[in-house]
Amino acid sequence: MHQPAPRPIRLTRAVVCALVAIGLGFLGLVALIYFKQHSMIYHPRPYDPSYAQVLPANGEEISYTLPFGKQTAFYIPARDNGRLPARLWIAFCGNGSLALDWTTILAGYPNSDDAFLLVDYPSYGKCQGYATIANMRASSDAALDMLAKRLGLSGEDLDPRLCTIGHSLGSAVALDFAARHRIQRVVAISPFTTLREEAACIIGGPLSHLLIESYDNRSSITEIRKRNPEAKIAIFHGTDDKVIPVRMGRELAREFPFIEFFAVDGANHVGVLSEAHDKIIHWMNN
């Protein structure tokens, strides 16, 4: 006659099954984060009809082809129609925005001598391909080279005029770009310290090491300082930012005292763009 298993054995089996289930669940979470991390970082979308009239009348598309597909950036020349802008601002958006969103943020820009090059991530807007750090570097460099050719200028002509501005992930791209060029000014809005440390805030420190690639703003700022000690950097960060905490912006400013830091009271991650609009524009022209 079959005898039921003693209670301690049944309990042990239950514990083992529970541990196996927890382990499998954890492995599933790890696999999900590892294989889906790109879609967690980048949120590409095309331009919808509402953007049809956004590019100013004097603006133009800058198209170029890279190994990963056709790319399209946007150039807004200086309003004085001079061939050489006093400053060329290269703008990079957040991971949920598009390059042409800068046209709203920069509305009413007072300096008619400045020009803007608005660059989308690969797979965003009118761009093909796949967004990675390497692909974005290639795309932004190619956009600048194509613009220089269109204007009949050399890199030496543009170098003393280059500035960058970026928001959120775009601030890391702006700093990364500045670390590879002789930039005069950088505006970083809502920056993280490193993408890995930002990921740790969301998924925890151990899981953040699953990140395949990570922008490192500390490293970029260090390189900017080496490349051009006279470069000016400003950080604008909302004190109510729940996406990238303001402590990260403050930490960068503490580590690099030459950075000008502006805390925007009560502003959240996106609201900082409108609430600090006038201060940002003023600093860009100061």
Model-derived regions, located:
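Hydrolase active-site cap/lid region
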Residues: 171-224
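Catalytic histidine neighborhood in serine/cysteine hydrolases
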Residues: 250-271
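Membrane-embedded segments
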Residues: 68-146, 150
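Catalytic histidine-centered segment of alpha/beta-hydrolase-like enzymes
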Residues: 243, 267-277
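Short beta-strand/loop motif that positions the catalytic acidic residue
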Residues: 224-230, 234-237, 241
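Alpha/beta-hydrolase fold nucleophile elbow
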Residues: 153-168
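Short alpha-helix in the alpha/beta-hydrolase fold that links the catalytic acid
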Residues: 104-105, 217, 245-254, 276
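An N-terminal hydrophobic leader/cap segment in hydrolases
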Residues: 14, 18-65
